[in-house]
Structures are given as structure tokens and as C-alpha cells.
A protein has these predicted regions:
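PAPS-dependent sulfotransferase catalytic domain
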Residues: 19-43, 62-166
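A conserved segment at the C-terminal end of the G1
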Residues: 1-8
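Generic alpha-helical segment signature
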Residues: 42-50
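Short beta-strand-centered segment that lines the nucleotide-binding/catalytic pocket of NTP-utilizing
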Residues: 8-20
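Switch/coupling sub-region of P-loop NTPases
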Residues: 50-55, 70
Length: 166
């Protein structure tokens, strides 16, 4: 996607987590949950979160592109917030074979603490099931805003899938 002239592949950004108020997105503490509740229940605070997020993005957008692609893995947790503060956004959900996905996570040695669930197979399986359950909810509620991309289909038909995305 980032090779397209209207898209900037910004990498994995923390901006959504920052404006959500959650702190640690995987294991938020009580204060983080209260902050998040304030963001999603107050129109004024939600608008402030939108402004802060867009301001953070503007510092990246040096090429005046139309779209910025944030591929932070845990953004799936925040799709409800994304739809609230960025209703015009498009979301791409890249589905991958569960075994391939979990094995990749399990075998990777992450430097940050946000992927601790990936070092235990049972915990990883539970996390993956929760992830798919939550994505089912998001897809049901926001089906017109979420493009479900099958990774294997992308590998086998890159040109076709790329055209569908753009």
C-alpha cells in the first residue's frame, strides 16, 4: 500500500493508544480504564482525542498523502474508538492462518512488554480466540468500514487484492 502515491506507510504508531487514555492496551490499570471510559462517553473529550491524534499524524505527513496506514497490531482492540473519533477512517483487517499467526508470535522474541501473552502457548491460544471474537463483533457492527483481507489470498493474488484495496 505504501508504494501508492496517496498512501503513507507510517509503520506501527502508538498515537491511538495515547489518545485512548488506556496506557497499557493489553493490561490497562483502573486509571487507564477510567480514562478510556471518559474518552468514549464524552463528546468533548472524544473530539479532543481526535484533534490530538490528527495533530500527531500531521507531523508524519510530509508528502500530503490522502491516507496514512498505521499497522500497530493492537489497534484491533480500539476499533470502536477509531470509529468514534475517526468515522471517515477505513480499516484493513489482515486475517492470517491461525497456526501461522500464533507460531510467528510464539517464535519471535519481542523487546517490548506488550506481547508477553505470546510466550506461553495456552495464553497465546486464548488471546488469539479473544482477538477473533472481538474482530467478529467489529466486523458485524462496522462491516462497511472494515476490509477483511485474507493474507493467503493476498500472497496468491497480490495485484487483484491490491486493486480492491485502492
Amino acid at each position: 500500500l505504501s508504494s501508492h502515491s496517496n498512501i503513507d506507510g507510517a509503520g506501527e504508531l502508538n498515537y491511538l493508544t495515547e489518545v485512548s487514555g488506556l496506557g497499557n492496551i493489553i493490561t490497562p490499570d483502573q486509571k487507564g480504564l477510567e480514562n478510556f471510559e471518559n474518552v468514549i462517553s464524552s463528546k468533548k473529550i472524544a473530539l479532543k482525542a481526535r484533534r490530538e491524534y490528527l495533530k500527531s499524524l500531521s507531523s508524519l505527513n510530509t508528502n500530503n498523502v490522502k491516507y496514512i496506514c498505521d499497522k500497530m497490531p493492537h489497534n484491533f482492540v480500539l476499533i470502536g474508538l477509531i470509529r468514534l473519533i475517526l468515522p471517515e477512517s477505513k480499516i484493513i483487517y489482515c486475517k492470517r492462518d491461525p497456526i501461522d499467526n500464533c507460531f510467528s508470535l510464539y517464535s519471535h522474541k519481542f523487546t517490548e512488554l506488550s506481547h508477553q501473552y505470546s510466550y506461553d502457548q495456552k495464553t497465546l491460544a486464548q488471546y488469539y480466540k479473544l482477538h477473533t471474537s472481538l474482530m467478529d463483533v467489529w466486523i458485524k457492527n462496522y462491516k462497511n468500514s472494515i476490509f477483511v483481507l485474507d493474507n493467503e489470498e493476498l500472497v496468491n493474488n497480490q495485484e487483484k487484492i491490491s486493486k480492491q484495496l485502492i
